[in-house]
Amino acid sequence: MQQYSSKYNKQAILLVNLGTPDNYDTKSIKRYLKEFLSDPRVIEANPVLWKIILNLIILPIRAKKNVHTYKTVWNKQHNKSPLLFYTENLADKLDKKLDNYIVDYAMRYGNPSIESKIKSLQDQGATEIIIFPLYPQYSATTTATVYDEVYRVLSKLRWQPTIKGINPYYDNKFHIQTISQQIKEHLKKLDSTPDTVLFSFHGLPKEYFDKGDPYYCHCYKTYRLVKEELQNEYPNIDFELSFQSRFGPKKWLEPYTTVKLEEFAKQNKSVVVIAPGFSADCLETLEELAISEKENFIKKGGKEFSLIPCLNDSNQHVDMLYNIIDEEICLKK
């Protein structure tokens, strides 16, 4: 990131993504998962019982199990996870586009932490920080916990910066247009028209939705608005919605991505999958969808499977974020 002197406008924008292990070894993965799965916003359970289950069962098993999956998707050239690599590049590009703002990034779990970046921005003279969680759809498990951590950090500061937040952008016109265009461009590259475009969002325990989390509604609205943008141009394509990455025995939001793909496979359909809830490619897209779900789909009789990459550090993503920020805070040109 660029370093700014006091002559610059003392405003900053902090992009925040979910997080990643520092490396794909067991120790790094275990440390990351412990922080992530210890968040009561993520796992709503009896804290004493959950701590025992997490430390004695889940962490020892999942840390070892995930070494191979993280190694498979790891950007070995830069020795970074894809999520970290793309988020860092995205912030750097947006920083160059916004002359009067310091733009940086942080991870909710792992490194670089929200605390370290808020302190870094203060050291550069920022007295106002705009928090931009890179989650289009709001959930207490994602967006809310970002602000929990921001205000935890602020509670320890004697001189607090002014904090503003960018709203979830699940139905923002710039987001819908960008996702729609992304699908169009991908379809043009294919040799034949697919039977279905499947919108796969990260799942959530259904009880969270029942308690008032609006995540499902936000996902459905993103899906509906993009579908409305495309269905007239592609009348022979079915647009469907599903939820992936189920964890644990509880019922999660349905339909499940695995189940939908198996249904399509039995009908010998060709499928294009997009994961518009992820701002950057990560384990859930590069391994779960691109490898595991694809292999299962083909094995079950599916015809063709194609995954649309996330927006990542593309110029379209940079422009979209710029327009959303400008719309919300009226950027000073």
Curated annotation (Swiss-Prot):
Q: Where in the cell is it found?
A: Cytoplasm
Query: Please, which domain of life does this record's source organism belong to?
Result: Bacteria
A Pfam family annotated for this UniProt entry: Ferrochelatase
Q: Does the keyword Magnesium apply?
A: no
Record-listed Fe cation binding positions: H202, E284
Which pathway does this polypeptide act in?
A: Porphyrin-containing compound metabolism; protoheme biosynthesis; protoheme from protoporphyrin-IX: step 1/1
A Gene Ontology biological process term? heme biosynthetic process
Report the main location listed first in the record.
cytoplasm
Question: Top enzyme class of this protein?
Answer: lyase
Keywords from the UniProt entry: Cytoplasm, Heme biosynthesis, Iron, Lyase, Metal-binding, Porphyrin biosynthesis
Reactions performed catalytically: heme b + 2 H(+) = protoporphyrin IX + Fe(2+)
EC number in record: 4.98.1.1
Entry's family note: Belongs to the ferrochelatase family.
Protein task: Catalyzes the ferrous insertion into protoporphyrin IX.
Q: List the PANTHER family hit by this protein, alphabetically.
A: FERROCHELATASE, FERROCHELATASE, MITOCHONDRIAL
Question: Would you tell me the protein name for this molecule?
Answer: Ferrochelatase
- The encoding gene is hemH
